[in-house]
């Protein structure tokens, strides 16, 4: 169903891959992009469970907006193994204004399609989503 505000639909594969990440843990991350011509959000890249946070960060384009989901594993101060699912809205300052507007207006609706997001992060440059930021937001 298209979003009235931005006219964006969400491809079924987006939800399916997210469920695989959440329930089966078969992916470390998923990068989503908006296909403007088809007016829908689609899966652009899927990260294997063995890939690192650096691999994930490197998969985001330098000058284009993206949505991403990252399954972050960490150990608490009490030495407990935990996991948090992050939703990251990547919107670099160097992206086209039109692209930033489309991603901003579609974000909330898209995020609602992904049931199980635990932490949301908005990032305009790599320092705003560095591993230190992820670690502090996970706790």
UniProtKB/Swiss-Prot annotation:
It comes from the Eukaryota. Gene3D superfamilies: Severin. One of its GO terms (biological process) is actin filament depolymerization. Keywords: Actin-binding. SUPFAM superfamilies: Actin depolymerizing proteins. Residues 5-139 form the ADF-H domain. One of its GO terms (molecular function) is actin binding. InterPro entries: ADF-H, ADF-H/Gelsolin-like_dom_sf, ADF/Cofilin. One of its GO terms (cellular component) is actin cytoskeleton. Belongs to the actin-binding proteins ADF family. PANTHER family: COFILIN-RELATED. Actin-depolymerizing protein. Severs actin filaments (F-actin) and binds to actin monomers. This is Actin-depolymerizing factor 1. It comes from Petunia hybrida. The lineage of its organism: Eukaryota, Viridiplantae, Streptophyta, Embryophyta, Tracheophyta. The gene is ADF1.
